[in-house]
């Protein structure tokens, strides 16, 4: 079959390593006589680099539900969310997001117990996102049904779902998730600080931040052949633009334990980046918070976030920290933009194609994000005119 992105999941099942190919070509019979070998340049033998994209928190508040509802078709339309920023997630080899809602089914609801229509995750997937992180403080909002139906719907759609599990055996078989992309193996780990005081229903598993467990997960990921290990952590304090000491300590510990890079979420605002250099001279990127993608939150900095691009396994960069870049975007509420639905506008988007009210709002958001990022280690800033790998 054909698909936009070709990569394989590597899962540990019992004592066997099973390769599950997401895009497989028909097998061809081997020729009776091997053709003469043709000299190949060294560069052609090396695997192609991997282009990664990370997005922040995919929220779904009550006003978003109402704005997305199509009363004529009796369905929900979330495609406007990604109309102007979906190009990047579609071009990436792997695009990762934090799905901070459950897919319990009807009745749908916003804060404080999120239950979103299936159309929401389908729109996110249609925008090019392949990896859905589900270990966050809202994953237990709707109990067992919310957790298990979310898992089932994402997996049934052929998406990589990471962070919550039906039971302990499900976790053993599926975690850590190791993917083979362009000849490279990479693993995404996902953990949350908590679940708003809710506990998993007996049997269900949520990946909480537990250093003993995480250390074992890193070892297991490497044993499965992971060349790169990236930890995606739900942590920090909401609406605070700088990481706290707990975040910094955990990031440093993760790197010391063998994680290559750390990407954070939960504060719902952008937080700066840090490059941690280990004694072997390797540089490891930590981005403490990507902010929101779309939400109806009201505090300064909630109405947008940043997309983080990264290149792994490239000869053009000494490490991923060298090749990393970010682009800010703003997602105004319809009552401010005059649009029917929520839509994200990236930095540098043509003013002539935006509502008049959005021109200044986008500029203000970008300036705020730039100010926040200036407090950390520098990574390249891009915009609509020069974004990409």
List each language-model region with its residue ranges.
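Bacterial N-terminal signal peptides that target proteins for export
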Residues: 1-10
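Bacterial N-terminal signal peptides
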Residues: 10-18
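C-terminal motif of bacterial Sec signal peptides marking the signal peptidase cleavage site
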Residues: 20-22
């Amino acid at each position: 079959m054909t698909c936009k992105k070709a990569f394989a999941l590597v899962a540990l099942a019992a004592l066997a390593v099973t390769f599950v190919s997401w895009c497989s070509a028909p097998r061809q019979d081997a020729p009776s006589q091997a053709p003469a070998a043709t000299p190949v340049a060294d560069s052609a033998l090396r695997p192609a680099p991997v282009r990664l994209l990370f997005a922040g928190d995919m929220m779904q508040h009550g006003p978003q539900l109402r704005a997305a509802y199509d009363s004529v078709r009796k369905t929900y339309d979330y495609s406007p969310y990604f109309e102007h920023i979906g190009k990047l997630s579609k071009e990436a080899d792997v695009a990762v997001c934090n799905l901070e809602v459950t897919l319990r089914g009807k009745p749908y609801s916003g804060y404080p117990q999120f239950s979103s229509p299936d159309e929401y995750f389908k729109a996110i997937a249609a925008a090019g996102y392949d990896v859905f992180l589900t270990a966050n403080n809202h994953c237990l909002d709707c109990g067992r049904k919310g957790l298990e139906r979310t898992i089932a719907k994402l997996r049934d759609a052929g998406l990589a779902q990471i962070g919550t599990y039906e039971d302990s055996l499900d976790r053993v078989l599926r975690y850590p998730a190791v993917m083979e992309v362009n000849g490279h193996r990479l693993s995404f780990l996902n953990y949350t600080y908590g679940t708003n005081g809710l506990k998993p229903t007996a049997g269900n598993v949520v990946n909480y931040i537990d250093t003993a467990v995480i250390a074992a997960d890193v070892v297991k990921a490497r044993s499965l052949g992971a060349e790169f290990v990236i930890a995606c952590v739900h942590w920090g304090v909401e609406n605070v633009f700088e990481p706290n000491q707990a975040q910094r300590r955990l990031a440093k510990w993760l790197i010391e334990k063998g994680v290559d890079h750390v990407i954070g979420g939960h504060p719902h605002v952008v937080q700066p980046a840090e490059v941690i250099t280990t004694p072997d001279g390797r540089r490891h990127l930590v981005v403490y918070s990507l902010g929101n993608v779309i939400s109806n939150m009201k505090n300064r900095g909630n109405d947008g976030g940043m997309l983080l691009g990264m290149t792994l396994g490239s000869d053009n960069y000494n490490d991923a920290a060298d090749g990393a870049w970010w682009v800010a975007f703003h997602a105004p509420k319809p009552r401010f933009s005059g649009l029917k639905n929520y839509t994200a506008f990236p930095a540098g988007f043509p003013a002539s194609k935006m509502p008049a009210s959005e021109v200044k709002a986008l500029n203000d958001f970008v300036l705020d994000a730039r100010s926040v990022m200036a407090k950390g280690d520098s990574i390249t800033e891009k915009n609509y005119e020069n974004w990409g790998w």
